């Protein structure tokens, strides 16, 4: 007989097959899902559509409060492009020289330095101009700021004071201290140009022959040799005057707006002297940068912001901030205007505006300044104690020192090096920078970290050498860098500071600038060394020390 199939077995087998099939199908589905996910993950994702037409703007520090106010008002208005993008300004405060480098590196799409001089620097050496559309929105004349009684001693306000009066005062009074910024700043370069104009007896069309004429160059050199020291710019000068008062300087070159700014903060009043020979202006432009990838919407944002700067609302704000507006419908003699004699300035001045020459002539003015400037003796006092080996600090300091040596460009400047650890060692006497730059760099590169911190002995060594040289016709200065606390000197802090105070009056005035490198530097000691000389102490770290040495180089 044939064997009959068991129905229960058939049913069980069928169920098992269904389960296996379901599992297989499930695994296939999972694998397909993973494959799809990985495919989507590895595939280029669409770039989200932009929601803003952003303009990245760098602006010079002296107009920080004004620019922040303007940008906040513009962004609050929520202007939009025809395509619906929100127009936005992102503004960054930056020194003009750094602004030029950042613009050339593609970091910004617009800039607003204190002078159009910097726009030429942005395009220098480029085949294709980077600077596009530009316009000025605020102006301020270059003036000589003086204490009211100092100006009166020169005949103010009955007499119009000029560069010759300043020269006569500096020659007749050895205690008279005046300054202007380095020619690496717009204010300093415009001042130097004004001096050359005065020496040439011109107000227009200055030529290269005028700059090299012996009578003119002798006049400028005589004036420059009475400068106490130079500096990094007008904002830094005003900050020092606010901190130290009239003992810091008797007269100094800044913009008119800075006189108003200072007088609003102090009971000791400055007056603005508009040189009788004529003066120049800082014109505060805003310029679009033709960066690769600049969009039409970003251009529209620039133009909208430009028009906003020129609007009646913002031009009134410009005037309220102490600048002169470019809108000539706004009267400087309006009762609400800060440009008034009560604030130390004169809305009817300057009577004579000097003509701006070509970029080629301006380059020649700067190179001529290096020949005419007051020469300097500069000692670099360098901490090489054991702690300088930490965090690669010594290597960063060496790079910064070498950068400083590159920045010192005066034809007659001298630089020396005084390293210290357990004691002063391996000193390099003052050398002519133009012929010994490489040798000085080599000595800097040989420095090694070891030992303790004989800071006071090192400063005393450099100070005594400058006193022995007795070269009062030079700027004499010590730039000190230390990362720690004095613990190895034979001279006491009190003995050293008393010697400095005494000899700076009876002997050779020496400026001392101190860098506290890192968080362990003793600023009580550094300030005690710097303050009596008219110098200052500032903090740096491995990321900022190179920039600080570069800033300090502008004082010489």
Residue ranges and their predicted role:
Residues 44-184:
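N-terminal segment of the mature folded domain
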Residues 40-48, 326-379, 386-393, 406, ...:
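Acidic, polar low-complexity linker/tail segments
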Residues 267, 484-533, 538-540, 549-551:
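VWA/integrin I-like adhesion module and closely mimicked acidic/polar interface patches used
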Residues 414-446, 461-472, 489-494, 522-532, ...:
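Short beta-strand-loop
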Residues 203-274:
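Ligand-binding pocket segment of bilobal, Venus flytrap-like solute-binding proteins
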Residues 371-432, 448, 455-460, 474-482, ...:
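Von Willebrand factor
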Residues 132-144, 217-224, 266-294, 298-299, 306-329:
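Periplasmic-binding protein-like
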């Amino acid at each position: 007989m044939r064997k009959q199939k068991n129905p229960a077995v058939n049913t069980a087998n069928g169920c098992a097959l269904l389960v296996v099939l379901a599992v297989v199908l499930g695994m296939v589905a999972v694998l397909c899902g993973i494959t799809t996910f990985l495919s989507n993950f590895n595939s280029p994702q669409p770039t989200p559509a932009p929601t803003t037409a952003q303009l990245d703007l760098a602006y010079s520090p002296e107009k920080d409060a004004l620019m922040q106010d303007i940008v906040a008002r513009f962004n609050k208005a929520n202007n939009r492009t025809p395509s619906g993008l929100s127009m936005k300004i992102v503004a960054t405060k930056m020194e003009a020289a750094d602004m030029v480098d950042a613009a050339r590196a593609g970091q910004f799409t617009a800039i607003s330095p204190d002078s159009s001089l910097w726009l030429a620097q942005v395009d220098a050496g480029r085949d294709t101009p980077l600077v596009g559309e530009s316009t000025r929105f605020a102006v301020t004349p270059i003036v000589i700021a003086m204490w009211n009684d100092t100006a009166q001693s020169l005949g103010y306000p009955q007499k119009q004071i000029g560069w010759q009066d300043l020269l006569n005062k500096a020659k007749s009074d050895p205690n008279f201290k005046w300054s202007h910024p380095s020619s690496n700043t717009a204010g300093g370069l415009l001042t130097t140009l004004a001096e050359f104009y005065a020496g040439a007896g011109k107000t227009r069309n200055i030529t290269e022959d005028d700059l090299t004429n012996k009578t003119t160059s002798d006049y400028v050199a005589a004036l420059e040799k009475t400068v106490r020291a130079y500096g990094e710019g007008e904002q830094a000068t005003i900050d020092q005057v606010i901190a130290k008062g009239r003992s810091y300087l008797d007269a100094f070159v800044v913009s008119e707006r800075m006189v108003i700014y200072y007088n609003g903060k102090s009971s000791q009043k400055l007056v603005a002297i508009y040189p009788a020979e004529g003066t120049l202006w800082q014109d505060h432009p805003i310029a679009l940068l033709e960066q690769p990838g600049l969009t039409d919407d970003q251009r529209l944002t620039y133009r909208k912001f430009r028009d906003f700067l020129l609007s009646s609302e913002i031009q009134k704000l410009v005037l309220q901030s102490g600048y002169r507006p470019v809108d000539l419908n706004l009267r400087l003699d309006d009762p609400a205007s800060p440009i008034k004699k009560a604030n130390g300035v004169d809305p009817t001045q300057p009577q004579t505006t000097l003509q701006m020459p070509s970029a080629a002539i301006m380059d020649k003015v700067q190179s001529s300044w290096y020949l005419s400037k007051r020469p300097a003796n500069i000692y670099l006092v360098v901490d090489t104690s054991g702690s300088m080996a930490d965090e690669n600090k010594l290597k960063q300091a060496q790079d910064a020192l070498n950068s400083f040596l590159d920045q010192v460009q005066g034809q007659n400047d001298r630089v020396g090096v005084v390293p210290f650890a357990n004691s002063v060692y391996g000193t390099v006497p003052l050398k002519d920078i133009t012929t010994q730059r490489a040798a000085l760099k080599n000595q800097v590169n040989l420095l090694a970290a070891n030992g303790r911190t004989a800071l006071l002995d090192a400063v005393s060594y450099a100070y005594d050498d400058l006193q022995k040289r007795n070269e009062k016709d030079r700027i004499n200065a010590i730039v000190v860098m230390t990362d720690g606390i004095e613990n190895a000197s034979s001279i006491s802090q009190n003995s050293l500071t008393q010697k400095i105070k005494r000899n700076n009056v009876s002997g050779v005035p020496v400026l001392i600038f101190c860098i506290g490198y890192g968080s362990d530097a003793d600023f009580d000691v550094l300030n005690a060394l710097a303050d009596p000389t008219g110098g200052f102490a500032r903090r740096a770290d491995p990321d900022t020390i190179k920039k600080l040495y570069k800033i300090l180089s502008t004082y010489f």
